[in-house]
Amino acid sequence: MRKTILDACCGGKMFYFDKHDERVLFQDIRKVSTHLCDGRSFEVNPDIQADFTNMPYEDKSFSMVVFDPPHLLRNAGKSKMADMYGSLNEKASPTGYQQIKYGALYSDWRDMLAKGFKECFRVMKPGGFLIFKWNET
């Protein structure tokens, strides 16, 4: 079966009831298997490991693209979240509950998202659908 849906930043596939949907090509730049601070296991195991700003697909390949990019930008200072999960900065490593689960953005996040949108529209067929999810908290 040819995959007709691309999830460009699938992460832990929390967007899906069926995490093995045969119609979806799951892509993420990360591959992670760990346990979260509350003891739950968490896995990022994409079909394709690739960067959403430079995707390895031909133009007009998918009838639907799901774009749920990393959205963690700030978690610093003396906040409760920083106490619980740590904080991010330009030198942060991919550790800590929130960074592992949600991915992180850095100072060039606007350019990164613009490149991601350009790639999503490039690989989407004419008349296709783009589902964009963003969280600004």
Segments from the language model and where they lie:
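Class I S-adenosyl-L-methionine-dependent methyltransferase catalytic core
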Residues: M1-T137
